[in-house]
Amino acid sequence: VPLGVHLGKSKITELDAAAEDYAISTRRVASLCEYLVVNVSSPNTPGLRKLQDPEFLKDITAQVKANSEVPVFVKLAPDLADEGLKHAVDVATQAGAAGIIATNTTIDHHGIADVGAGGMSGRPLAPRSLEVIRAVSAMTELPIA
């Protein structure tokens, strides 16, 4: 079974220092796994989703690629608008990502009883995840997981 490591910035790391935070983590774990995932989409780390913006995502993906020899995937949120999704996919592709992981959990709890903070997965997310997968497949030739 291939072992992958999902990387995310520390909760105390400022957004402007995120690329270096990912690089440090990459250097520590890259030799232990078969692939890495740039996770910029978890709703549970304050500010993490802002890293899906092209200005951050390009540097983060490039830093992870530069500090490892294993394939690097980028994991995106299902809550991105189509334009944001397109920008993120384009940047990930240009930065050398091996594929896109679509999607992480959603922060959209519309129509669901109050379940508290954090991401939601499962059946309520399935329709949107399928929409994102279809959209990403039209945007890139990269594999989609």
Predicted regions and their residues:
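P-loop/Walker A phosphate-binding loop and immediately adjacent motor/lid segment at beta-alpha junctions
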Residues: 1, 51-76, 115-130
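Active-site beta->alpha loop and helix N-cap motifs at the rims of alpha/beta catalytic domains
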Residues: 1-37, 42
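Short beta-strand/loop segments at the ligand-binding rim of alpha/beta enzyme cores
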Residues: 2-4, 67-80, 136-145
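Active-site beta-loop-alpha junctions enriched in small/polar residues
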Residues: 6-12, 41-43, 75-79, 103-107
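Active-site glycine- and acidic-residue-rich loops that bind
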Residues: 9-22, 49-50, 73-93
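Generic structural signal for well-ordered alpha-helices
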Residues: 22-30, 54-65, 85, 89-90, ...
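A structural motif
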Residues: 33-35, 69, 97, 141
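Glycine/Thr-rich beta-alpha phosphate-binding loop at enzyme active sites
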Residues: 40-53, 85, 89-142
